[in-house]
Amino acid sequence: MSMFLDTAKISVKAGRGGDGMVAFRREKYVPNGGPWGGDGGKGGSVIFKVNEGLRTLMDFRYNRNFKAKAGEKGMTKGMHGRGAEDLIVSLPPGTTVRDATTGKVITDLVEHDQEFVVARGGRGGRGNIRFATPRNPAPEIAENGEPGEERELQLELKILADVGLVGFPSVGKSTLLSVVSAAKPKIGAYHFTTIVPNLGMVRTKSGDSFAMADLPGLIEGASQGVGLGTQFLRHIERTRVILHVIDMSASEGRDPYDDYVSINNELETYNLRLMERPQIIVANKMDMPDSEENLAAFKEKLAANYDEFDDMPMIFPISSLAHQGLENLMDATAELLANTEEFLLYDETDMQEDEAYYGFNEDERPFEITRDDDATWVLYGDKLEKLFVMTNMERDESIMKFARQLRGMGVDEALRERGAKDGDIVRIGNFEFEFVD
């Protein structure tokens, strides 16, 4: 049995940059040999790339952690460390990537070979050759590599279909798909025979072609999770035209018009935008007894409940089993599709701003101060912590440079305002030092 997985939660971590090197030339008349330490290489980024050969997120069922390699350390003679290769992660077309914490959409991957850098590799640390000045011609300062970005992501696959088949279970959606395309969905005389979306390519006699998806049957309450619930409703979101398949024979004992209203209510409840998509009503099983009578009653109820200014949906009587009325239905579907533009899947409020991922907002304070129960002052904040991890704490000159950076950020002044005294302990991460007033 083939497995279909359309959601996955994964972790990605880009590689850290390589550390810069402290090294000196050994030449006469050059103080301490002169600085000669090179920069570290850039860490590898994690890149998502669309592979049209993939159809599900099954590859992420057991492999949920993706980590790019770190850049090489800087070398002597001023040579740079080699940058790490990017980690390419293949995804099926139609994958939406969300931030698992905020739920915001990061990117929507639909085109073959489309790429998106989802976690950027860290910058390589600078070697001591970069810190030489007339006042300090032989610095013992080098930076550690910048950490790579690390994120928790939610992947959602929404299949790329132009036309979606919706309706109650066992109304004939799978049979319809199987006779108008080369798809071979599982067909049976019981509810929820279709438990995964099936995709087929339809080609009309006039030469038009489009992708059609048969989605698992909906029942009342699907938008709240009843039956297969919202598990597959997401796949309708990419469609431009909906074929609403209805069993006109009423073989299950339900009223066809009630079925029509119920399914539309579920679509509207799940996502109001789904009702913007044009629908064609497919009156199936017209070869069965009572179907003609039921269709006449259906049309009467539909007309009575439609506003005179609204366009009535087209109705096509067919029999998938007897192959009746299919050509006209497919031609009308192709024509409607040609006159329907793609719908915007997400608005600006759904999308995550780039600023939230890379760089710092200059208007935000670069650090925060709290105090632990043991009276230790604790400093934290993205910008401050980035400076800290890139500082080589094994070299006195690097520590002094870090202290100057803290002072320039206003840390000393802020600690005094909070009541810090000379000799108080200050902690950044796992590094502690005394506050000197």
UniProtKB/Swiss-Prot annotation:
It comes from Streptococcus agalactiae serotype V (strain ATCC BAA-611 / 2603 V/R). GTP binds at residues 167-174, 192-196, 214-217, 284-287, 319-321. PANTHER family: DEVELOPMENTALLY REGULATED GTP-BINDING PROTEIN-RELATED (PTHR11702), MITOCHONDRIAL RIBOSOME-ASSOCIATED GTPASE 2 (PTHR11702:SF31). This is GTPase Obg. Monomer. The gene is obg. The keyword Metal-binding applies. Gene3D superfamilies: GTP-binding protein OBG, C-terminal domain (3.30.300.350), GTP1/OBG domain (2.70.210.12), P-loop containing nucleotide triphosphate hydrolases (3.40.50.300). An essential GTPase which binds GTP, GDP and possibly (p)ppGpp with moderate affinity, with high nucleotide exchange rates and a fairly low GTP hydrolysis rate. Plays a role in control of the cell cycle, stress response, ribosome biogenesis and in those bacteria that undergo differentiation, in morphogenesis control. It is found in: Cytoplasm.
